From Swiss-Prot:
Facilitates the functional incorporation of the urease nickel metallocenter. This process requires GTP hydrolysis, probably effectuated by UreG. The gene is ureG. Homodimer. UreD, UreF and UreG form a complex that acts as a GTP-hydrolysis-dependent molecular chaperone, activating the urease apoprotein by helping to assemble the nickel containing metallocenter of UreC. The UreE protein probably delivers the nickel. Belongs to the SIMIBI class G3E GTPase family. UreG subfamily. It comes from Synechocystis sp. (strain ATCC 27184 / PCC 6803 / Kazusa). This is Urease accessory protein UreG.
């Protein structure tokens, strides 16, 4: 019986803090679990290289996928590139506990294919304005955890965190969300706890 790793997708608009969250999660979890990462960029491996430079994990545990087109397709309609990258990492490091998949920068409509990930974390940032949660879209309404990042910028951009809290509750119903400032690790422990909560539920696959 071989353990199948928990696959966690991280999506969100360009500049929202996806890679920063991924770095923080890797550093918080790497002493307890066997981790690997797959990043998606259209023509480069910039995010993968950033994580290597940040020493989030050893370089051989971080694979960059160059989608060569719309990054949404590689995480939704045709996930073959990402599935191949996961298979490569599993072959090298099995048993893995978690594999993180970071999408390319996207809009509010991007979603991961259910065959690709078990959980989705969707990252938005306060600097985009307090109207973002009520704009909706699958990332806002259907992600397993909504991460509202860069709360330290709220006073500078005139964003009201109270409004964002109200609208996130309205749009998500019972689904959880968290306010974060990844520079100071504010809210990070909530994200870590959320991810860890799902580990025991992964079934063993033959």
């Amino acid at each position: 019986m071989a353990q199948t790793p928990l696959r966690i997708g991280i999506a969100g608009p360009v500049g929202s803090g996806k890679t920063a969250l991924l770095e923080a999660l890797c550093k918080a979890l790497r002493q307890k679990y066997q981790l690997a990462v797959v990043t998606n960029d259209i023509y480069t491996q910039e995010d993968a290289q950033f994580l290597v430079r940040a020493e989030a994990l050893t370089p051989d545990r971080i694979l960059g996928v160059e989608t060569g087109g719309c990054p949404h397709t590689a995480i939704r309609e045709d996930a073959s590139l990402n599935l191949a990258a996961i298979a490569d990492l599993e072959a090298r490091f099995m048993p893995l506990d978690m594999v993180f998949l970071e999408s390319g920068g996207d809009n509010l409509a991007a979603t991961f294919s259910p065959e690709l990930v078990d959980l989705t974390l969707y990252v938005i940032d306060v600097a985009a304005g307090d109207k973002i949660p009520r704009k909706g879209g699958p990332g806002i309404t259907k992600s397993d955890l909504l991460v509202i990042n860069k709360i330290d910028l709220a006073p500078m951009v005139g964003a009201d965190l109270g409004i964002m809290d109200r609208d996130a509750k309205k749009m998500r119903g019972e689904k959880p969300f968290v306010f974060t400032n990844l520079k100071t690790a504010t809210g990070l422990s909530t994200v870590v706890d959320f991810v860890e909560h799902y580990l025991p539920t992964k079934v063993l696959a033959s």
